[in-house]
């Protein structure tokens, strides 16, 4: 009876050794200036504007393209591009800046100065509602039933801080600029590239090859093993689609290169998807004649926003918009590793440039508390109801 017991012990010990291994959480790549998304686990970087990060779902996903439709004078879209580049310098990311109008070195000299002290933490509390003070004589200016209602939160801010804050009234320290690893592409100084059978104009083809060479040479290609610490490449493309890039979509409706920018975006997104890089591109949409071309450009971008400046328009003198400098429209939100995207809680957005900071807020119009509202006075009613009403006074019912 002893032998079977030993055999059973041996067989039971063999049966206990299985190939089962406990599944552990995969290790995420840690890169300074990045964090994983809580929605889809995608690696995110900050755009340099915390309120813009909140609008587009927490930040820019690595491997994606952000399209910014320029305002009429390219003032605020250029500022967003500078915030995007400045955030890369503070986080230690590598930069690639391409331009055809202004030299990239000139744009780099205009980057805003970062705020690295404790004052930046106070920016998160701006725009928060304050409790109503019963002793304040201004608390009963509107109906009493609305007095205890919570005020509209105009400021857009996340519960956790991501990114840095910048002082728009100062430029970045030259020592920070010199320490940054920066690559430039100035179209007017580049040697023309033979297109051959390619449908791309020479400037677009040269720009695409320059980005591809940089990604492969500096080790940002995700398909190749990294020989050193991983980093993110930030690509800034200024005013693509303009005439200076050899494109004619801004000149006529039926342009000869109507598919040039679309083809360029196809190839660019292919490079971004397989590399640790993120791009921001500005396009003068108000100059592009064909709406179909602009629609293709938006659909070929992962994230798309548009800026409408009040400068030179009737809205600049409209008292309803006196606290803002323009409107922001969300054209497209990325859908990455999921079926649906995070929809913003509001589509009525406006931006303003304070003395030191560019912010995006909910467009909220407070109640009209002025005493000179457009209502008919009692004197007008009395005169209008009289049988001998004269002048511009009409009978009101």
Curated annotation (Swiss-Prot):
Family named by the database record: Belongs to the ELP4 family.
Subunit structure and binding partners: Component of the elongator complex.
Species this protein is from: Danio rerio (Zebrafish)
CDD domains reported in the protein's UniProt record: Elp4
GO molecular function, one term: phosphorylase kinase regulator activity
Entry superkingdom: Eukaryota
Protein name: Elongator complex protein 4
Database matches in PANTHER family: ELONGATOR COMPLEX PROTEIN 4 (PTHR12896:SF1), PAX6 NEIGHBOR PROTEIN PAXNEB (PTHR12896)
Name of encoding gene: elp4
Listed pathway(s): tRNA modification; 5-methoxycarbonylmethyl-2-thiouridine-tRNA biosynthesis
InterPro entries xref list: Elongator_complex_protein_4, P-loop_NTPase
The keyword Cytoplasm appears for this protein: yes
Cellular component, GO, one term: cytoplasm
Keyword Transit peptide attached: no
Localization of this protein: Cytoplasm; Nucleus
Keywords associated with the record: Cytoplasm, Nucleus, tRNA processing
Gene3D superfamilies: P-loop containing nucleotide triphosphate hydrolases (3.40.50.300)
GO terms classed as biological process: regulation of transcription by RNA polymerase II; tRNA wobble uridine modification
Function of the protein: Component of the elongator complex which is required for multiple tRNA modifications, including mcm5U (5-methoxycarbonylmethyl uridine), mcm5s2U (5-methoxycarbonylmethyl-2-thiouridine), and ncm5U (5-carbamoylmethyl uridine). The elongator complex catalyzes the formation of carboxymethyluridine in the wobble base at position 34 in tRNAs.
Signal peptide residues on this chain, from the entry's feature table: none
